[in-house]
A protein has these predicted regions:
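C-terminal subdomain of the subtilisin-like protease fold in secreted/lumenal serine endopeptidases
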Residues: 3-15, 20-26, 33-35, 60-63, ...
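Catalytic nucleophile serine of serine hydrolases
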Residues: 14, 44, 109
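A cross-domain feature marking catalytic cores of carbohydrate-active enzymes
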Residues: 15, 41, 66
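Active-site environment of divalent metal-dependent phosphoester hydrolases
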Residues: 18-20, 44-48
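Short amphipathic alpha-helical segments and helix-helix/interface helices
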Residues: 24-28, 50-54
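Extracellular S/T/G-rich loop segment that most often corresponds to the catalytic His/Ser-adjacent loop
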Residues: 35, 51-124, 140-143
């Protein structure tokens, strides 16, 4: 993505795992060319600083937590400031599914594409703050 991407392009990374300096470095290097990377915070109810690539930080790296329809922090979402940049809808999201179907699912992998879409539309702004963020520093809700 970094080698082929252009400034203004957006990459969605809905993946996660334990801490990996190699993964973090790859995201930081790839984002240095201007591609915006939207990273899922993870679904472990844990500090996102313990998970890669969510803990990667840089000017073009945006880590996304999840909220419900009432702007409440999702019980499963990872947290932490840094690395969390924005919160987006991630609870009970209707999405495409296997074999051409649809399913209603929850996770930061649902929230992160919302944020990527906002960046593709040309920029993000603060739509308020999420309620009940476990780190005590309420994440801003991304909006266009």
């Amino acid at each position: 993505v970094g080698a082929e991407g252009n400034s203004g392009d957006v990459a969605n990374m809905s993946l996660g795992g334990g801490a990996s300096q190699a993964m973090d470095n790859a995201v930081v290097i790839a984002s240095s060319g201007g591609v915006i990377f939207c990273l899922a915070a993870g679904n472990s109810s844990d500090d996102a600083n313990n998970h890669s690539p969510a803990r990667a930080n840089g000017a073009n790296i945006k880590t996304i937590s999840a909220s419900d329809i009432n702007d409440n922090f999702a019980y499963f979402s990872n947290y932490g400031n840094p690395p969390i940049d924005w919160c987006a809808p991630g609870v009970s999201i209707k999405s495409t599914w296997k074999n051409g179907g649809y399913n209603t699912i929850s996770g930061t992998s649902m929230a992160t594409p919302h944020a990527a879409g906002v960046y593709l539309l040309g920029g993000a702004s603060n739509g308020g703050t999420v309620n009940g963020d476990p780190d005590g520093n309420s994440d801003e809700i991304i909006t266009h």
